[in-house]
Design a protein with these regions (language model features):
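Elongated, amphipathic alpha-helical interaction scaffolds
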Residues: 1-216
């Protein structure tokens, strides 16, 4: 599902939604957002909630509720913080013993994750109750300002600059590098690529201007 097929000036402020399903039935929402949105956190929550309800049939048992990952690639200052990658996860932590994290029972562990006794050990690989709940990742692309040394950083550098370093080895970047060979693109693909790069450049310019004017 995509909302990126706009041919107007608003194209530079578009967002792209991708919904992927793993072989385990888990859902991953990938969203790219260029323009500032005050209620973006709420929209993240809404998107995950909608995916959960859309992908369970009426009358299904609750154990058919899907695990959902929400990956949000944003080109604006979302929230306030010093990092450029954030991970949100649910924890059920004891109020009186804060080191006590609620785990699934043995039966729940086996039913929902299929885990038995760990190989060669008389212990069960126990999942936390929070592992059943959605997880969120936020990549604040414009805040990335370091040398890319990890696969994740290499991808973020690509998302920020639109170029891939010759020594980048992150999975998937070799395919992306091929797609960036402009001379092999069709006329329509070249136009899409140029418009995308112009969108990134324009949004970065707007953000820097707002910073200079004290709005950020």
């Amino acid at each position: 599902e995509s909302e990126s097929n706009q041919e107007t000036e608003e194209d530079k402020f578009n967002r792209v939604d991708i919904l992927a399903e793993s072989d385990k039935g888990e859902l991953t929402i990938i969203e790219i957002q260029n323009n500032r949105e005050l209620t973006y956190f709420h929209r993240m929550l809404y998107g995950v909630s909608k995916a959960i309800t859309d992908y369970i049939d009426l009358g299904n048992d609750y154990d058919k509720v899907r695990k959902v990952y929400s990956i949000n690639i944003v080109y604006f200052e979302l929230g306030q913080g010093n990092d450029y990658v954030y991970h949100g996860k649910t924890y059920f932590r004891g109020l009186h013993n804060t080191s006590d994290i609620l785990k699934l029972s043995v039966r729940q562990n086996q039913k929902f994750f299929g885990f038995g006794l760990a190989d060669g050990e008389n212990v069960l690989e126990r999942k936390e109750a929070g592992d059943l709940f959605p997880e969120y990742y936020i990549l604040r692309v414009n805040d990335f300002d370091r040398i890319a040394t990890t696969p994740l950083d290499q991808w973020i550098e690509f998302l920020k600059t639109g170029s891939i370093a010759p020594d980048a080895t992150a999975p998937g970047l070799s395919q992306a590098r091929e797609c960036l060979r402009i001379d092999t693109l069709s006329s329509a693909e070249k136009n899409d690529y140029v418009r995308h790069m112009e969108s990134i450049r324009y949004q970065r310019s707007v953000l820097e201007t707002r910073r200079d004017e004290g709005f950020v």
